[in-house]
Amino acid sequence: MAKNTQTQALKILPLGGLHEIGKNTCVFEYDDEILLLDAGLAFPTDDMHGVNVVLPDMTYLRENREKIKGMVVTHGHEDHIGGIAYHLKQFDIPIIYGPRLAMALLRDKLEEAGMLERTNLQTVSPREMVRLGKSFVVEFIRNTHSIADSYCLAIHTPLGVVMHSGDFKIDHTPIDGEFFDLQKVAEYGEKGVLCLLSDSTNAEVPGITPSEASVIPNLDRVFSQAEGRLMVTTFASSVHRVNIILSLAQKHQRKVAVVGRSMLNVIAHARKLGYIKCPDNLFVPLKAARNLPDQQQLILTTGSQGEPLAAMTRISNGEHPQIKIRQGDTVVFSANPIPGNTIAVVNTIDRLMMQGANVIYGKHQGIHVSGHASQEEHKMLLALTRPKFFVPVHGEHRMLVKHSQMAQAQGIPSENIVIVNNGDVIELTGDRIRVAGQVPSGIELVDQAGIVHESTMAERQQMAEDGLVTVAAALSKTGTLLAYPEVHCRGVVMTIQPKLLEELIVRTIENFLTERWSEFTHGSNGSTEVSWNALQKELESSLQRLIKRELQSSPMVLLMLQTDTPIELDQVPQNVSTVSATSATPAPRKKVVLTKTPEPKVKAKPEKKVVTTAEPSAQPVSTTKVYRRSRKRSTTSVSS
């Protein structure tokens, strides 16, 4: 029996890229079939300690993996394809269609991650149509952007055509001679576009975004004026910009040494596919370039965004093994900082200048243009497509608002425009658009080991802000201390004497054992069993309260227990170890008496060891110690 398309709805679920820059990921769902459009990443902020990349929460796709029919990719930027290798570890994507350059870059990523066998990569040509499942047919329409081989998409669904602009600007003098296919866009507008989802990045900017070709005379001037070594940094994926730089190097008779893995990779693929045309002898290894006269050298490198491990950042820090800044060097930043990177870029520029480099940077130099459309280009796309419904995407909140205002000015009724959040479920019928619900929409953080969960990030942040206090205590099966506890503080601002803090900690442990030991013991058949895990958690909480009260801060508290009681392996908590009864001398349980004198007096214990932040770690009481981060709960805006 045929399904009634008048009552069915098309669902559109943006999982990333809204009210932010990066993580562009969108899901289209109809009749139990899912089409995925792009799957990008973002880069971590300064407070995401140890994190390499940020991904959208893909819980919805993990839970509906059997519905996924495939993916379409608009272009090869990291914020559109950078997450795919990570996601393939969690769910299969049967087939991925995309431009030649994007697929070449993606293939490298998947091979490196060992994920190439989890999907099938297929390249497309302009105006090519592909079918995914029974519900979706997608046509690829060439647009213009800062990377070669970029597309907008016409997604045919049972309810009508939904157009997605991809990242775009309307460049009338493109470097590669490939124009935005506005004719095809207009044809869809004539036939009728149900909904348009459009890039909002530069929706605040009046006028028209300058052509990529406009940077050529300004960069040419810089090349002409540079008397010594010339170093240029830009986005590795800005193929058109890289092509301009290489052409100018050839014109000014400079040999090019390419530094940075991503830059080398993109240039290799772009040359193979014909997007960059230059002779082989233009390039020299970095070691060979150092033997050339300064005026014949051009070092093309990554690091335009101040990335910590990128080549230009390492050069500015004096950490690059082969490149040291010297007086007379000219360094060109042919890129503007993306949101969140401004401080890192400014610091990199400052360090380069301090070492004597002449640094060329900033919008006033005319050496960079955006790859995103400004207001007049947005108006043109709206006029050509004439969509019934409109959803601004790919941008921060103010950009989305400005874009929606332009759409209203172009004649789209306000009730036909929705500004949505990541995770919102847009429900689209032939005559209505609405937000019908929400799916998980947080973020997933990835470090070198894998996914970083919320609790781990909270612990890292806590240690970064307030430091770490570790307490090691050895207990007997009767609840007495086998030895005087060890206390170590790292990164903690001490508002009281370390010795006094140690004595307070010891007294808290002794009081706890005296007053509450019986809560964690129970007997059977004449033997006594101890709930070590529960005891550890409660004692650790008591120490946390004490330290917070005394230090007026909240360092992470890590309690490590040792016991002389044999314990079954499945009963041993991660931070409890067993010790031989002979490995430590039992210490008599004694109260530590604190007085109001400047130096508290306590009965001397021969085995006592006092450890402060200035001392190296003391030898442990026993030969076995297990260290573990505590699982203290902490509120955080990061979701797993």
Curated annotation (Swiss-Prot):
Signal sequence, start to end: none
Annotated positions binding Zn(2+) 2: 79-80, 167, 394
InterPro entries found in the cross-reference section: Metallo-B-lactamas, RibonucZ/Hydroxyglut_hydro, RMMBL, RNase_J, RNase_J_2, RNase_J_b_CASP, RNase_J_bac, RNase_J_C
UniProt GO BP: rRNA processing
MF terms (GO), sorted A to Z: 5'-3' RNA exonuclease activity; RNA binding; RNA endonuclease activity; zinc ion binding
Gene Ontology cellular-component terms listed: cytoplasm
Compositionally biased intervals (Basic and acidic residues): 598-610
Positions annotated to bind substrate: 368-372
SMART domains xref list: Lactamase_B
Domain of life: Bacteria
EC number(s) reported in the record: 3.1.-.-
Region Disordered, residue ranges: 578-640
Keywords (A to Z) from UniProt: Cytoplasm, Endonuclease, Exonuclease, Hydrolase, Metal-binding, Nuclease, RNA-binding, rRNA processing, Zinc
Free-text cofactor note: Binds up to 2 Zn(2+) ions per subunit. It is not clear if Zn(2+) or Mg(2+) is physiologically important.
Residue pairs linked by disulfide bridges in the UniProt entry: none
Cofactor(s) it depends on: Zn(2+)
Cited CDD domains: RNaseJ_MBL-fold
Main location: cytoplasm
Coiled-coil stretches noted in the UniProt entry, renumbered to this chain: none
Binding positions (Zn(2+) 1): 75, 77, 145, 167
Enzyme class: hydrolase
Subunit-structure text: Homodimer, may be a subunit of the RNA degradosome.
Record's function text: An RNase that has 5'-3' exonuclease and possibly endoonuclease activity. Involved in maturation of rRNA and in some organisms also mRNA maturation and/or decay.
Protein family per UniProt: Belongs to the metallo-beta-lactamase superfamily. RNA-metabolizing metallo-beta-lactamase-like family. Bacterial RNase J subfamily.
Identification of the protein by name: Ribonuclease J
Source organism per UniProt: Synechocystis sp. (strain ATCC 27184 / PCC 6803 / Kazusa)
